[in-house]
């Protein structure tokens, strides 16, 4: 069985590759020539640099692959941007690259048995902030960030094609060894400070990256899961305060100054951070799109369909996952 995992050099992609190898797949990693392959050192991994920008070249590349190797049995399309200095790039990379890829797979007769799109809870936008009920799959999708909007467009491209079966996963906050966004808060608390945006506690949910990889393969390998979509989370709900204090405990910090700052101040900080990032030509964790995520109070989602259809049971609690992550950060010199 052959599998292609795009975005394989990224945080989530690396764990998807590890899971594929563990399950005995002939594993193809879709990576750019200039990508960091330091986490893709297993000699069994095969590489392909997909030519997303050129529709004809991509089609010919996939046609040539199919003729020589045969189509992949499964494809996990995980490639994408989570932050950028140019918002237009969200739509180009997350949405239009997906459109060209889908078209090329069909035109090149390289259709997989199943195609999995790694999307995001952000494709739904604001959750109910009065009763804080979970976001459900049948709720209207109204993303409020450019990132979320671009992921929704990609989802729609996948849903509209009829060449092969698909499944769409929408993970909530993904954390684990090597993740950089949550690491910002971990590093801040390690330094003795914690800044939380907004005076109303934020309800947040998580999924450990290894559990997400397991869920992805359960969705691919279950023949009954056809043309469906799921939220992926560990099923627990936390407040931002609980998350910060758990980090403090696990880091062994006796004294941390926890400060809640008004949303207007957080917005200013994100805007300034984005401006400085643009001046340096580097994408930054704190940006205007990120502020809209920080502003949202309800990140609770209904993961029951995932458990019912796939029998998915996360192996990691937030505590266990953070313990493993912090150990990795320390072992690799991040902390």
For each of these PLM feature ranges, what is it?
Residues 222-286, 319, 323-324:
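Mid/C-terminal beta-alpha module of Rossmann-like enzyme folds, strongest
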Residues 301-309, 313-335:
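Amphipathic terminal alpha-helices
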Residues 77, 99-146:
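Conserved Rossmann-fold NAD(P)-dependent oxidoreductase catalytic core, especially the SDR/UDP-sugar
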Residues 149, 153, 179-184, 198-220, ...:
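Substrate-positioning beta->alpha
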Residues 128-173, 194-198:
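Catalytic helix-loop patch of NAD(P)-dependent Rossmann-fold dehydrogenases
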């Amino acid at each position: 069985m052959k599998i292609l995992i795009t975005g394989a050099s990224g945080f989530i992609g690396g764990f998807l590759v590890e899971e594929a190898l563990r399950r005995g797949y002939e594993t193809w990693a879709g990576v750019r020539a200039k990508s960091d392959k330091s986490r893709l050192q297993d000699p069994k991994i095969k590489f392909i640099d997909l030519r997303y920008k050129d529709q004809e070249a991509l089609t010919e590349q996939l046609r040539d692959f199919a003729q020589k190797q045969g189509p992949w049995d499964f494809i996990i399309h995980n490639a994408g941007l989570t932050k950028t200095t140019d918002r237009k790039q969200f739509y180009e990379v997350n949405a239009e690259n997906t459109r060209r890829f889908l078209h090329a797979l069909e035109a090149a007769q390289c259709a997989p048995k199943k195609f999995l799109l790694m999307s995001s809870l952000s494709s739904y936008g604001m959750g109910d902030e009065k009763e804080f009920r979970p976001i459900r799959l049948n709720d209207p999708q109204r993303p409020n960030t450019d990132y979320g909007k671009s992921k929704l467009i990609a989802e729609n491209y996948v849903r509209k094609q009829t060449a092969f079966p698909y499944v769409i996963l929408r993970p909530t906050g993904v954390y684990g060894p090597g993740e950089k966004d949550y690491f910002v808060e971990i590093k801040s608390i390690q330094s003795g400070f914690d800044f939380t945006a907004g005076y109303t506690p934020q309800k947040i949910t998580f999924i450990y990256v290894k559990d997400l990889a397991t869920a992805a393969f359960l969705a691919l390998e279950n023949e009954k899961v056809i043309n469906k979509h799921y939220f992926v989370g560990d099923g627990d709900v936390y407040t931002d305060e609980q998350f910060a204090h758990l980090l403090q405990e696990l880091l062994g910090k006796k004294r941390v100054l926890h400060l809640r700052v008004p949303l207007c101040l957080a917005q200013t900080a994100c805007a300034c951070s984005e401006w400085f990032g643009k001046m340096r030509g580097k994408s930054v964790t704190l940006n205007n799109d990120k502020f809209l995520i920080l502003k949202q109070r309800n990140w609770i989602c209904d993961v029951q369909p995932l458990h019912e259809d796939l029998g998915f049971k996360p192996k990691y609690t937030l505590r266990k996952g953070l313990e493993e992550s912090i150990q990795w950060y320390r072992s690799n010199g991040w902390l």
